[in-house]
Amino acid sequence: MESVIFSINGEIIQVNKEIITASPYNLFKRIQDHHLKDEAIILNGINYHAFESLLDYMRWKKINITINNVEMILVAAIIIDVPPVVDLCVKTMIHNINSTNCIRMFNFSKRYGIKKLYNASMSEIINNITAVTSDPEFGKLSKDELTTILSHENVNVNHEDVTAIILLKWIHKNPNDVDIINILHPKFMTNAMRNAIALLGLTISKSTKPVTRNGIKHNIVVIKNSDYISTITHYSPRTEYWTIVGNTDRQFYNANVLHNCLYIIGGMINNRHVYSVSRVDLKTKKWKTVTNMSSLKSEVSTCVNNGKLYVIGGLEFSISTAVAEYLKHGASKWIRLPNLITPRYSGASVFVNDDIYVMGGVYTTYEKYVVLNDVECFTKNRWIKKSPMPRHHSIVYAVEYDGDIYAITGITHETRNYLYKYIVNEDKWIELYMYFNHVGKMFVCSCGDYILIIADAKYEYYPKSNTWNLLDTSTRNIEYYDMFTKDETPKCNVTHKSLPSFLSNCEKKFLQ
């Protein structure tokens, strides 16, 4: 029986010539055409045992592929050009891909040009980017590869600070490619992380590129009323799905988002005032009743800053209150601030540079009902008066934008809506063009380049150009609307001294 001799890494294997003759694969066809009997055919880059497995497949159409031998069989199948075995090996590798081996499989797929494996391993890296940073091979990704990964719309980061920590870890291994930092969008980062990057001597250039990472975009939480029960829904920009988080039966409450939790504050249940505060985790959907406020009240004003929920003013039965207090997320005790100069409810409160500004609302007692234009600022542990609003307004909504305050007024006794800008450094109010009119209740959110207003319709206001954009979207039955980013960055006053500790804590928090 004639044989064909193969030499693999110095080892000899003889193959029945009938197997070679019957083979439809390219390598063996060429052997049939050109092989001289007495010559040993040298095969380079192939494992001896993998070649034996391929011969078994050609004889019996069966092959034993495991996670331990799949790579060497796949290499042999690619070199010898046995497409069915290539497909079986690729399927095995894709089936067994995970966060601990996806970078190795990614590199393997590039080396041998295996598109399906490349796509699957890239997808695994994108879905597990925070985990794969612990792989020693992570630092060997090229600048272009990491840019592609972190620019993917579905990369699994939920805040731009996470992207920053991933980049800083990679830059530590690739100090000549620090300009990769320019893929960051500073407006989505916390002040602490921006300060940390500046202290490292890195500069993020201003970019006009669109934001591609869906996970860092604003999440949305909406409460809609229906037959005395309000439904809470949450929209994730990464999954692009709305999910029902829970329900509440309160009226005249206020709400705010802090550390990925929605707080429902005060209000009334069955026409009775309450001082309880409920919290729902928007990720786990678990509810918790947190420590009660100091008194029963509704129509409070709220704002959040530095991991704390601030509750200001409100209506205690029929009397407006001057009480101001805050609760640190995860704490069990409310801390009282000095009382407001003027008690009020349904006004607006907003933080600018760690100072609280409170404006408008109603001062009421059993004998009085006064619509306010007063503005107060809490700074250096005391309330001081600021320039009043141009008009008296019972309902005010306000947001901070680029260091100033933009206030939009609702309607109760007023005849129209107004838009104002308060220039903080000049203590000065100016009136701006108002696009819509005759709207009572609304919600206002600062969204990077624009301010979003949910009123009788959805509006975008662009402060830099003083222009409006109307979005054709239903806003019926909305009781609460807010946009937020998932901020889990450790709180820290970042200095040269605290920088190493801050970055270490961020890495422990973000990269698993």
From Swiss-Prot:
Disulfide bonds: none annotated. Residues 2-67 form the BTB domain. It comes from the Viruses. Coiled coil: none annotated. Keywords: Kelch repeat, Repeat. PANTHER family: KELCH PROTEIN, KELCH-LIKE PROTEIN 8. Belongs to the poxviruses Kelch family. This is Kelch repeat protein C2. The lineage of its organism: Viruses, Varidnaviria, Bamfordvirae, Nucleocytoviricota, Pokkesviricetes.
